[in-house]
Amino acid sequence: GLNCAFAVIPCDNLRKAFKQNVEGITDDANITGLSALSAAFKKGWKWRDDLIRYLNKNLETLLNAIENHKNASPVVPEATYLLWVSLKNPKRKNLQSHFEKYGVGINDGIEFGKKNNIRINFATNHQNIKKASKRIEAALINL
């Protein structure tokens, strides 16, 4: 990758804790990454706005598929392309394996300390989301 990322953290205490936690884990940005970052800030706003609209359409498709399932509660993301879904009393222990049987790759929340939750990455094309939504619905019905 371009090896160039940053975080804007207004809270002093949180910013200090963040710096301590990433020290030694991340590399410094390289010149190519800095050039790309500069171009993005100068000319990338339309692309960004288009991307946000695209991702929101994907999110809406997923939410429509999930909303009819009383045992699934999605948590609408604030600033990411990862949708968390809380599952009420799933019969299956291995959620990742269950969803894979339906052709959907999810992350089991247990990896992140969130038992009975799944994480869905919706940063893909609309066609994939439409297919995945139908598969997710089937997986939820048989959960």
Name these PLM-found stretches.
Residues S38, W47, Y54-L63, S73-S86, ...:
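Conserved glycine-rich beta-strand-loop-beta hairpin in the small C-terminal domain of fold type I
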Residues G1-N56, L63:
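Conserved core segment of the aminotransferase class I/II
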Residues S97-G105, F112-L143:
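PLP-dependent enzyme catalytic core of the Aspartate aminotransferase-like
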Residues V8, W84-S86, N121-A123:
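Short hydrophobic/aromatic beta-strand micro-patches
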Residues A39, T61-H69, H98, A139:
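Alpha-helical structural signal in soluble globular domains
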Residues N71-P74, V104-I110:
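A short linear hydrophobic-aromatic micro-motif
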Residues C11-D12, K88-P90, N125-Q127:
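Helix N-cap motif at beta-to-alpha junctions
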